[in-house]
Amino acid sequence: IDELDIPTLGTIVHEYIHFLQNVSTPWGLYDSMVRYNIMAETYAFVENATSTITLPLDIDYSPELANKIAIVKCGMGYCPLADTRRNDFRIDVNERICIHRKYKQLNNRTLPVITLDICFTDGSKQAITLGANIIKESMAALYQMLIDETATHERYDLPYNLVKIIAEQHFSAIASDNIKLITICYISLFSLSPAEVLINEL
């Protein structure tokens, strides 16, 4: 590690934070268990098939697993890194991000949904659902920038700089305290509703 340059060390720390998010938080463990159950039921579907299997698979997961998948999907929120519709996620920080809180009924649970109205520097606007995807990336990027100040992820404010930008616009008292922002991101992953906890704690 002593021989690594600062950018490489920062990248390694960023990815190691993702490892910790996945193995040391209730959200990470719940998500992993749901994915494992998906693999188990998929394997059982293939193993028990009595006719030719066609792709893509169309599996009716058990009601219990389907419910857990819906909880994870709701908590994960939007994933900009999987969005192929745009390749520049620079946020216009002069336009205030609007935060909306709604609720979604899922069987016998009421799940909070936090949506954000975001303006980009190219003039386009987008409403996104805040969730663990963005929170995890923002947290890892904040850690990375503690080591490598040049890792600003300029073209990718969403997801890497979003928590910082929200803090600067709405919670200025803590916006300059990156350690506190990292801590709040981490705390939010101790819930099945990470976005709500993040906004509440900010």
Where are the regions a protein language model picked out?
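Post-HEXXH active-site segment of zinc metalloproteases
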Residues: 6, 22-64, 117-122
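Long, well-structured alpha-helical subdomains associated
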Residues: 60-202
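Short pre-active-site segment immediately N-terminal to the catalytic Zn-binding motif
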Residues: 1-13, 127, 131
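Active-site recognition of the HExxH zinc-binding catalytic motif
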Residues: 10-23, 140
